[in-house]
């Protein structure tokens, strides 16, 4: 008896542990469709199923029963994202450390006509009910649950993202039977076998109509005519290449879900930039000697009066010596003593193929009253420039962002504010983890990109923005703001946070004061209702996002100390970024920069 009691207790204990480790959320099988999902107070999901009558799934005596042509896969730890799939079952397994969600994906041909309705978030104690949709008193569609994703929100609570699709109803079985002729059971079977075996006399000629007659398929190239000519030559049929849908080139460095263009053809530096209209005929000078010295002195806006005559008739010919010292239109001219004696002097590195006999009056290039601070630094070919150390890639201060508390100017944002952004395919709020740049007195040049309906955004040259072709079903791609063209489409959000395309109608340059570059946890941000990126380098976007996320976690340990003051609150780059990126330059290839 003691052994039996111990065995009985062991069975009860094992059953309790097994019941706690595996939670069955239900399965619809192949004869029903999921339409309802509930999440209990403990965060465990349960789905409910229904056999919609508008799809012909009914077992009543008045209608002929029909079974959906559905094929289901076993439970796997995946999301049913294919076009013809829905989530038919859920199983939650506790492996000791965390709970994993496994789904049963079923495929049905009728899902090819289904359309996306919405995506909702379900937390503990919440539910969603879909089902039959009626329009004008008739059944028009069925709202079903297609995709289910398990996430954890900012409060460390389980949350499920449910994708709801609407599948249109088919014609009922009664209406389809009324349209068919009244045939016996044997004749109905023969009618169904016509297309496969072609053995029914009533529809015997349906294949012969599709094929050309034998005489036309074997037509001779020469035909006898009852005329003065013996033969008549037929023209050969032109063979054309069949139409095939073009495919985009595959790029192994592409990042999901973006589509990138193929690499451009290599070309020489400053190719096709020589101005042919200003070329004048003149005598060719002798080749320069080997003792040429490069002169890198900048051009002076003051016009130097030359010591030699300026008319074409009095202009001296070039000397026939190896130490020829000509004049270059972009540099100051030499004085009279140096020019007449022809001594060896410093010359510019660039020497044109010939010198025109007549030199026009020097016109100094227009110099602006100020130089933007960010443009003088250039685009540095190292990681310091990519992480924001040398190239300021930012937004203008008058741009607006949407937060959970309402609309704010981008210059008024603070670390921790949740702004509207994109997380994969969902429009959601993401926290601002730091500012790459936040300088109120910085003067910069911005690209003002506008659409016909009033949307606009201001970006510096190398800041990334999402664009695509204005055709339907075109992929998104990240390009620099200076590379946006008039034929491109940018992506804006509506009042209901739905992303749509808008064609660019105007691109201009503006000068404004103040640069701001907030960094969100997702790496993207919606500014002035326009989707853009927080970064300035496409190849290292993931590296930049990972670097700043790790820095934020590490610096939070020292943030509460009295002697530590976070530089990100002041708008500067994090402490030590330039040192760390200089070390990373030794390990990361320059081809990624």
Curated annotation (Swiss-Prot):
Post-translational modification: The C-terminal domain displays an autoproteolysis activity.
UniProt-annotated site: Involved in auto-cleavage, residues: 460
Glycosylation, residue list: 95
Residues flagged as site, Essential for auto-cleavage: 463
Tissue: Expressed in 4 to 7 sheath and socket cells of the anterior sensilla.
GO CC annotation: cell surface; extracellular matrix; extracellular region; plasma membrane
Gene3D superfamilies noted in UniProt: Hedgehog/Intein (Hint) domain
Site (Cleavage): 394-395
Similarity field: Belongs to the hedgehog family.
Function, as annotated: Intercellular signal essential for a variety of patterning events during development.
Name of the protein described by the UniProt record: Warthog protein 6
Organism: Caenorhabditis elegans
Lineage: Eukaryota, Metazoa, Ecdysozoa, Nematoda, Chromadorea
């Amino acid at each position: 008896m003691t052994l039996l009691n111990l065995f009985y207790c062991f069975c009860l204990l094992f059953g309790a542990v097994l019941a706690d480790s595996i939670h069955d959320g239900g399965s619809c099988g192949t004869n029903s469709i999921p339409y309802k999902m509930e999440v209990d107070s403990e965060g465990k999901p349960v789905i409910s199923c229904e056999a919609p009558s508008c799809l012909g799934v009914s077992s009543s005596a008045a209608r002929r029963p029909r079974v959906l042509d559905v094929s289901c896969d076993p439970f796997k730890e995946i999301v049913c994202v294919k076009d013809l799939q829905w989530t038919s079952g859920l199983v939650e397994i506790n492996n000791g450390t965390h709970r994993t969600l496994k789904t049963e994906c079923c495929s049905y041909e009728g899902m090819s006509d289904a359309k996306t309705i919405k995506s909702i978030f379900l937390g503990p104690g919440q539910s969603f009910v879909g089902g039959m949709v009626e329009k004008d008193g008739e059944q028009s569609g069925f709202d079903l649950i297609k995709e289910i994703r398990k996430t954890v929100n900012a409060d460390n609570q389980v949350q499920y993202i449910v994708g709801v699709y609407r599948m249109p109803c088919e014609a009922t079985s009664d209406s389809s039977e009324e349209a068919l002729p009244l045939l016996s059971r044997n004749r109905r079977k023969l009618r169904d076998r016509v297309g496969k075996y072609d053995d029914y006399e009533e529809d015997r000629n349906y294949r012969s109509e599709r094929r050309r007659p034998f005489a036309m398929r074997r037509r001779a190239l020469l035909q006898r005519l009852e005329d003065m000519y013996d033969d008549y030559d037929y023209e050969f049929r032109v063979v054309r290449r069949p139409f095939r849908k073009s495919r985009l080139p595959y790029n192994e460095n592409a990042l999901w879900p973006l589509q990138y263009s193929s690499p451009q053809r290599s070309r020489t530096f400053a190719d096709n930039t020589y101005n042919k209209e200003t070329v004048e005929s003149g005598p060719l000078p002798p080749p320069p000697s080997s003792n040429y010295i490069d002169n890198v002195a900048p051009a002076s806006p003051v016009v130097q009066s030359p010591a030699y005559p300026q008319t074409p008739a009095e202009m001296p010919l070039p000397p026939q010596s190896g130490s020829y010292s000509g004049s270059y239109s972009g540099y100051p001219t030499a004085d009279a003593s140096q020019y007449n004696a022809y001594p060896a002097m410093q010359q510019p590195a660039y020497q044109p193929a010939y010198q025109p006999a007549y030199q026009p009056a020097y016109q100094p290039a227009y110099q602006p009253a100020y130089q933007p601070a960010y443009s003088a630094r250039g685009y540095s070919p190292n990681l310091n420039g990519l992480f924001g150390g040398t190239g300021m890639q930012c937004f203008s201060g008058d741009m607006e962002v949407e937060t959970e508390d309402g609309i704010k100017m981008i210059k008024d944002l603070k670390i921790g504010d949740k702004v509207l952004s994109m997380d994969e395919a969902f429009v959601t709020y993401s926290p601002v983890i730091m500012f790459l740049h936040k300088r109120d007195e910085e003067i910069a040049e911005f690209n003002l990109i506008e659409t016909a309906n009033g949307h606009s955004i201001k970006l510096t040259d190398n800041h990334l923005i999402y664009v695509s072709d204005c055709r339907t079903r075109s992929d998104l791609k990240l390009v620099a703001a200076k590379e946006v063209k008039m034929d491109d489409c940018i992506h804006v959000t509506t009042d209901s946070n739905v992303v749509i395309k808008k064609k660019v109608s105007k691109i201009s340059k503006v000068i404004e004061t103040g640069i701001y570059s907030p960094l969100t946890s997702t790496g993207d941000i919606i500014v002035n209702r326009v989707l853009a990126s927080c970064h300035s380098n496409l190849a290292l976007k993931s590296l930049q996002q990972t670097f700043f996320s790790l820095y934020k976690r590490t610096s939070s340990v020292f943030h509460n100390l009295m002697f530590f003051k976070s530089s990100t609150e002041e708008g500067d780059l994090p402490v030590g970024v330039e040192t760390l990126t200089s070390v990373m330059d030794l390990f990361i290839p320059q081809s990624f920069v």
